[in-house]
A protein has these predicted regions:
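Residues at alpha-helix caps and immediate loop-helix transition turns in enzyme cores, especially N-
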Residues: 2, 6, 81, 117-118
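Midchain, well-structured core segments that form catalytic/ion-binding scaffolds
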Residues: 112, 118-179
Length: 179
């Protein structure tokens, strides 16, 4: 429900700004600008990890501004970067900057739970970018995404003298464990 609403909002924004838009079965949407055979893909996502506990300073889905900062789920990961990328397309167009290929901002709806949206896009023959990047990261720029693994640790510790766990965090979604 939430990711689909975010998908429709992002597509509507692209349309209001006068861009070409498309959607793959409500799993992946895109906003596109430019001409040319080659396409730059800017890949992000609109879903968020489950809210979890009640320890929020501000309502998690409120998108409220406090002390000049926007607070809410997805502000940094990854709705904010997607909206920023769409407005970057607008700036490129409005400044009439020369580009010789298309730029497609792609936004999936389930990155936090396995990225089946990307698999769907690829497996159903939608156009693949010639080159791309993701704004889903930290500053300064990083040049790779972390991998994902799921595992269960079990058993008994028999040699307690060699084991020391200082901290192990986690959450509801697989990619929210922090060191």
């Amino acid at each position: 429900e939430g990711p689909k609403a975010a998908l429709m909002d992002a597509l509507a924004l692209g349309e209001r700004l006068g861009f070409k838009t498309g959607v793959a079965d409500n799993r992946v949407g895109w906003v596109e600008y430019g001409d040319g055979e080659e396409m730059v893909g800017v890949l992000g996502h609109l879903d968020v990890v489950p809210v979890g506990d009640d320890g929020w300073t501000y309502p998690p889905f409120g998108a409220e501004i406090h002390d000049g900062k926007l607070w809410g789920r997805g502000v940094l990961d990854d709705k904010g970067p997607i909206i920023g990328s769409i407005f970057a397309l607008k700036a490129i167009r409005d400044l009439d900057l020369p580009i010789d290929r298309r730029i497609r901002v792609l936004f999936g709806t389930d990155e936090e739970c396995g990225s089946s949206c990307v698999e769907y896009y690829v497996e159903n023959g939608y156009e693949m970018p010639t080159i791309g990047f993701t704004p889903d990261g930290d500053f300064p720029l990083i040049f790779f995404e972390k991998g994902m693994t799921r595992f269960t640790v079990g058993g008994k510790v028999t040699d307690k003298g060699n084991i020391e766990v200082e901290y192990f965090g986690g959450g509801i979604a697989a990619n929210v464990v922090t060191p």
